[in-house]
Amino acid sequence: MKKYAYFPGCSLEKVAWSYNDSSIETAKILGVELQELADWNCCGATAYSHVDQLLAYTLVARNLAQAEKEGLDMVAPCSACYKNSYFANKYIKEDADLSEHINYALEEDDLQFNGSIDVHHIIDIYANEVGVEGIKAKVKKPLEGLKVAAYYGCQIVRPRKGAEDLEDPQFFEIGRASCRERV
């Protein structure tokens, strides 16, 4: 299975440490190799991008350049980190002027953004690389009879690739335990 640069982000490092721990352990069980991104920084997942978009993209580009240096695609479990990283990666790749400005700033850290990696949410890796059968094969305690109403947040589907329906994404619903209950 592929190895990924793991970007936990500030929230998972401090407040949501249990989500961080479960993401790492689940990846191990499913055979997904995660290597924490070296010297990562905050992705600016606040309203900061509305204050200075160039600086906000530069913050993210520094992490992307670190992942490129390691030769690994990046994976983020935090939906805000994923959204910011995904869009920054996309826009910097598409805009030569933006890329030039960002690379000028990254020179200070002896880094360069080349646009050679992709950014994934960890659920995307589980659903599309490990797959339903791969997950089923690792289940130790089936959740028979348990109903789960999961909440993923809206940010995870904002940059969805492919034909997935943004209003009703189905890749979340691969487990038998999820249900559609009024919460």
How would you name each of these model-derived features?
Residues M1-R182:
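Iron-sulfur cluster-binding electron-transfer modules in prokaryotic oxidoreductases
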